[in-house]
Amino acid sequence: MEMDIQESLLRLLRPLGLQRAEALAGALAREAGASKGLHDSQVLARAHALSVAPVEGRLGDLVWQVRQREHDGAPQVDLRWGLHRLGLDAPSRASTRDLVRAYERRLADRNEPMVYSTLAERVAGSMAEHTSLFQGMAMAVEEARARRSDANRLRENAPWQGWLVGASRAGHEAALLACIGMGADARLPDASGNTPLHHAARFGHFSLVTPLVEAGADVAALNAHGWAPLHLAALHKHARACLHLMAHGANPEQPGWRGRTPTRMHRHEQTQAL
């Protein structure tokens, strides 16, 4: 399994012109196996902190380059200081958003000396839970490179909305808050008309209702099938999600598809259970 992960990482790293790609891929493969359960949204939120504001760095270990073929100079994204500073500045139990902010506070510090051996030692110790960000970063940089875009464009093109949906479906509040903090719109529906609040309600993640509403989510929004978040929570028997939605103004008598209300759907589910 580890070999499969390492080979996958190498395919991502080689096109980036990264030195010591094989050694780095091996280290990342080991860390990937040690960080099970980390949601992609959390990984990508941390990766974003290292991608939106590239710092100057010499060619060498852990320098990710976004190459622009039409220009002689290639912008560089150096992850050495960022990963190191996440470990130094953020508390050991920091939230995803705190980790992002901790890195952002250090972006101006461009002269911190860091070598591969020092970073590797750090990674092998207390940083194991955060090193998954490299895989997400590799994909983000490769995407930007394919578009002949510089590193700053990652901020404009980052698919935060998709990651916000992932966090809403998985129930990861820290990742959700980080995505919103990076500019994801809590009101924006996906291709099926489902907003992040629809996804949270569908899967019964009641703890996400308040942060989504505070970020502007509309409790009355209907998806493409004519369901509001409360309809979905009632349909899937998520009582606590229903209570939280109603506490934020969701109407249990709101008509949806074919005039069905959340109250009617709830009663139907109760009848079916008898």
From Swiss-Prot:
Coiled coil: none annotated. Residues 251-274 are annotated as: Disordered. ANK repeats lie at residues 192-221, 225-254. Its main location: secreted. Induction: Expressed in S.maltophilia clinical isolate K279a grown under standard conditions (at protein level). Keywords: Actin-binding, ANK repeat, Periplasm, Repeat, Secreted. Gene3D superfamilies: Ankyrin repeat-containing domain. InterPro entries: Ankyrin_rpt (IPR002110), Ankyrin_rpt-contain_sf (IPR036770). GO terms for molecular function: actin filament binding; protein homodimerization activity. It is found in: Secreted; Periplasm. GO terms for cellular component: extracellular region; periplasmic space. GO terms for biological process: actin filament organization. Directly binds F-actin, which results in thickened and distorted F-actin fibers, and affects cellular F-actin localization. Thus, may be a host effector whose function is to disrupt host actin cytoskeletal structure, which may enhance invasion. Exists as a dimer as well as a higher order oligomer. This is Actin-binding protein Smlt3054.
